[in-house]
Structures are given as structure tokens and as C-alpha cells.
Amino acid sequence: MSQKRQTKFQNGKSKTSENSSAKREKGMVVSGKEIYDAVGRSKFVLENLRHYTVHPNLAQYYKPLKATALQKFLAQNRKTTSFMLKVTEYDQDKTLLIMTNNPPPCSITHQDKESAPKYFSKDLLLKVMESHHQHKPTEDLWLPRMPQKKKLRSKLKPIFPLTLSDDPTSKREQWFRFSTDNDFKSEGKYSKVYALRMQKKTYPQLTFAPVHERASKKSASERPISKVIREPLTLASLLEEMPTRTAPGESAFRNGRAPQWIIKKATVIG
């Protein structure tokens, strides 16, 4: 029995080795340079397949995404917060150092007598100590109440006298009254203002002369004409106001001419 089992096992091994070799022969074997097939060279296999088997480095072709506005804002906010935190820590350390080297004076405990006069005068310290000793806990610390003034009447609301029918002698005041006929004697200007508004809307480029110019024109036209008889302007009246002055010249046109010196003979000395 043992011999039969050994022969079967050997036969099985030989069969498996044959099958594996046959599979290898049928399959594709990739060497370093060429590709072989059991039947022969396949026409469907690329010649430069070895160049495509290695994955290329795509990092050089990668374009990073641009940061959004929110990401930029958050990054700037983080930087600002970290900077403020560092400044605060530095200020705390600086303040602690200053307070350690220069402690402020205490008016209650006079342990540090040398530093007290640097900050406060002696008179002020004496006043503080006196007020501290004179203070009583039962003393009322509340300030006195201010006297309540009467409510002031607004200037926009006039006060009208009021007389009662039962008691005509009593005098009262109120902020309103009934309108009378005398209130409606003034000229109404609503229609004029409305007409001006409509004119401005229809003609926006229209310019109006200022009020003072129109008033000056009206006043100039309304000036009274004087009835005084005036004499005509003559040469004699002008000579009375501005008398003539003698000046060098010829005939009657000598007035106003600039003086001239005519040289008849001139000798040049060389």
C-alpha cells in the first residue's frame, strides 16, 4: 500500500509541474528587454511598453488650488490674534517688571517711606489720613437731593389766557385755542409754491435769479425821477473845476504834451 501511494504522489507532482510549465509557456513572460509568447511574438503588444509601466512623476504638472476669500480672512485673523496675544504677554511681563522695580506708595501702611513723597505730597497724605480717622460708619454718605425745578415750557408752544364762563375773574393758561376770523386774513401762498414746484419739475434746467437781485431791480425801477433842472456841461465849467497848466509845446495843443529838447548841433568826441 505504501508503494502505491508513493507512485501516485509522484505522478501527481509530475502532472502539476507539467501543468505549471504549460501555463508559463502559454502565458506572457516579461523580461528586462523583450516580451515573449508561447506561440510567438504578439502583434498586439506595444514595442515601448516598458516606458509606460513606470508611473510618471506628476508633481511637476500639479497646480495647487487658489485660496478662497474666506480662507484668506481666517488666515489673516489667526495671524492677528497670535500677534495680539504675543503683545499682551509682553505688556504683562513689562508691567510686572515696572511694578516690581517701582512699587506704588500705600497711604495706609507707611512701610515704604522713601517712595511715598515721589508720588504724593505730604499735605495730601495728611488730608487723607485726617479724613480716614474722622470718618464714622454711621454717617450718612448720600448726597443731598437737588431741588426739583419746574418743567420749562417749550418756546414753540405759546400760552393763551383762558377765562371761564362760571368765574370770569379766574385766570388760567392753556397751550391751544380755537381759531378766529382774524387768523385767516393773511394771503395764501400754497398755490404759488405749488406752481413753482411744478415749474421746476417740468423745466429742471431753468435757473431763477436770486431774490435780492430781483428786489434791487424793482427798487431801481421804482426810484423817483428828480425834477431839478440841470445845466449842460460846458468848457468854462470844466476849467473852473480843473484849471489848465502851462506846458512846453506849440499852439493850443501844448497842454498835456511831454517836454521835448530839440538838439540842432551835436559834436561827438572820439
From Swiss-Prot:
Pfam families in the cross-refs: TSGA13
Signal sequence segment: none
Region of interest (Disordered), ranges: 1-27
InterPro entries (alphabetical): TSGA13 (IPR029241)
Stretches assigned to coiled coil: none
Compositionally biased region (Polar residues): 1-20
Protein name: Testis-specific gene 13 protein
Organism for this UniProt entry: Macaca fascicularis (Crab-eating macaque)
Underlying gene: TSGA13
